[in-house]
Amino acid sequence: MKLNILISVLIFQLNLFSDISFTIDETKIIGQISSDKKTQSFLGVPFAEPPIGNLRWKEPIPKKYIESEFLAHKFAPACMQEERIVDWYKGVAIGFGGDPDYISKPDISEDCLYLNIWRPNNTSDSLPVHVFIHGGANKAGWAYEPNYVGDKLASKGIIAITISY
């Protein structure tokens, strides 16, 4: 599918640049460097046009970037869903003696087809890529659930990608 092509292009372009940006369709996608300077992140990068209006319930259409720059510094909303996964995470936190309030309900929207990308900072090496597709049986889940945030993998020399769908 076209998503595979987009991911391949993103990975290729991420490996070419030593700064924290890459270009898609003449739009500069601007990421950020982590506070410990070990990783770069590009959060909430759209891979398809929003599936709303006449695009609802249709096959995704690749994103047509029209901006000169896109700031990829925050997670995009999760797709529409029930709150059961949040309750599950809170139960896990309680089970391990943690604070259940650490887990908060994600923002949700029908406009939810986004990628999050993490990579090591200061390298132009070809790197392995790990793509996470969250679970939830198409009823719950989001690409930045605590167990899907990719900064730890990136600090170990891996490009990590999560997909919202």
For the regions a protein language model found, what residue spans apply to each?
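Non-catalytic accessory segments of hydrolases
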Residues: 19-165
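Absolute protein N-terminus
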Residues: 1, 18-19
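Hydrophobic h-region of N-terminal signal peptides that target proteins for export
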Residues: 8-17
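Sec-dependent signal peptide recognition
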Residues: 1-9
